[in-house]
UniProtKB/Swiss-Prot annotation:
EC number: 2.4.2.8
Chief localization: cytoplasm
Naturally occurring in which organism (per UniProt): Methanobrevibacter ruminantium (strain ATCC 35063 / DSM 1093 / JCM 13430 / OCM 146 / M1) (Methanobacterium ruminantium)
Transferase is among the record's keywords: yes
GO CC entries: cytoplasm
Keywords: Cytoplasm, Glycosyltransferase, Purine salvage, Transferase
Protein name: Hypoxanthine/guanine phosphoribosyltransferase
GO molecular function: guanine phosphoribosyltransferase activity; hypoxanthine phosphoribosyltransferase activity
Length: 188
C-alpha cells in the first residue's frame, strides 16, 4: 500500500550529524526531489483514516510537516493550519520551546482554540522532542486531537511521545539506520 514511500526511503542517503544518523529524504528534508506519487500515496492513506465530519482543521508542524498537511488538506477538503517557527504576536499566540536530537528552537501556535477538533500531521518522529511539546501545548489550549499521524517512525520516538502525552500516534513506516543504510517497512 505504501510501496513508493518504502522504496524511496530504503534508497535514501544517510549522513552523520555528531552521533546522530540522519536519513535525507524528500519527505523529511525536501531533498532529493520528492516524487509526487509518494506524497499522493501518503495523503490517500491518511485520508482513508480520518472521520471527515468531525475534523475542523488539518494541522502540520513547520517545516517538513507542511507539505504533508497541504496534501492531506487538498485530499480531504479540510482547512490547513501550520504551527510555525516564526512569532507573529497575534492575540492568543502560544510559544513552545522544543528540543530534538539535534537542535533547540521555538514554535508558535496561532488560530487554534479550546474545542477545535484537529488532525495533527508531521514528517518524522525520532527523539519525540517536537511532537511531545506540540501535543502537550495543544492539549493545554483545550484542542481536541482526533488523530496524530506521522509518516516515519525512527527509533523509539513514537513510544516516547505516547508515554509523554498519553496520545496514540499512528505512523506509516518504521525506519532505522543500520550500518549506514536505511531499513524501512510499512506499518499500514
Amino acid at each position: 500500500m505504501l510501496e513508493n514511500l518504502v522504496e524511496s526511503l530504503r534508497n535514501a542517503p544517510v549522513v552523520k550529524k555528531g552521533d546522530y544518523d540522519y536519513f535525507v529524504h524528500g519527505i523529511s528534508d525536501g531533498i532529493p526531489a520528492l516524487n509526487p506519487c509518494v506524497l499522493k500515496e501518503i495523503s490517500e492513506v491518511l485520508a482513508e483514516r480520518i472521520d471527515l465530519d468531525k475534523v475542523d482543521k488539518i494541522v502540520g508542524v513547520e517545516a517538513m510537516g507542511i507539505h504533508i498537511a497541504t496534501a492531506l488538506s487538498l485530499e480531504t477538503g479540510l482547512p490547513l493550519l501550520v504551527i510555525r517557527k516564526r512569532e507573529y504576536g497575534l492575540e492568543g499566540e502560544h510559544e513552545i520551546l522544543k528540543h530534538t536530537g539535534y537542535a533547540t528552537s521555538k514554535l508558535y501556535i496561532n488560530d487554534l482554540n479550546e474545542g477545535d477538533n484537529i488532525v495533527l500531521v508531521d514528517d518524522v518522529v525520532s527523539t519525540g522532542g517536537t511532537l511531545s511539546v506540540v501535543i502537550n501545548e495543544l492539549k493545554a489550549i483545550g484542542v481536541n486531537i482526533l488523530d496524530t499521524f506521522v509518516v516515519v517512525e525512527k527509533g523509539e520516538g513514537k513510544k516516547i511521545v505516547e508515554d509523554k502525552t498519553g496520545e496514540n500516534i499512528v505512523t506509516l513506516v518504521k525506519l532505522d539506520v543500520v550500518d549506514g543504510k536505511v531499513v524501512a517497512d510499512s506499518l499500514i
